Amino acid sequence: MVGTKYASEKRVFTDIKSGARITQLTNRGINFHFYFTENSFDLDGETIYFLSNRGHEETEIFNLFKMNLESGEMVQLTDEPKGIEFGKITKTPDSEYIAYVTENNIHLYNTKTRENKLIYADKEHMLITQLSFSCDKQWIGFNRNEDVDALPDGGPNYAGFKEK
């Protein structure tokens, strides 16, 4: 549920092989940062945004959370019934806006006002990927393609490649 707060799960330990100090931020549910090309950290250096199935532990429904890195406290920011699609989320460098895809819809979440609004809806059988904000935060670019069930090593767009 939006606004639900979760207590810190942080723990610190030393890696046996390297001797490096490790800080584990979460220890329940499935949690992950945005896609590896997207920055999950806020410019303030105190906050990280992440996706989690927290509250839906028996499913793969992921919603947006933020964590205070000092205290470890987490707050749920969205409650999408079908969840946010992995790899289909981005934010502005200052973390004011976060855009994400759920059910072929693009939502815009304002981290300052907590307003969450639908800004684009598409029909079924379309793929929306690679969201990106313009530098002035006035535009969101994204890929929109017909879903033709093309696979990385097969399908109609990969004629001549080895089939599965």
Language-model features: locations:
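Multi-bladed beta-propeller domains
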Residues: 11-33, 67-84, 111-127
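Low-complexity, flexible helical/coil segments
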Residues: 50, 58-64, 85-86, 139-142
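Beta-strand-rich domains and repeat architectures in extracellular enzymes and scaffolds
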Residues: 2-10, 17-62
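Short, flexible, glycine/charge-rich loop motifs used to bind or transfer phosphoryl groups or to couple energy/partner
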Residues: 12-13, 38, 55, 79, ...
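Asp-box/WD-like beta-propeller blade repeats and closely related beta-sheet repeat scaffolds
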Residues: 79-164
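Ligand-binding pocket scaffold of soluble enzyme catalytic domains
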Residues: 39-40, 46, 59, 74, ...
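Beta-propeller blade signature
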Residues: 64-70, 161-164
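Acidic/polar residues at beta-strand termini and the immediately following turn/coil
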Residues: 15, 42, 56, 68, ...
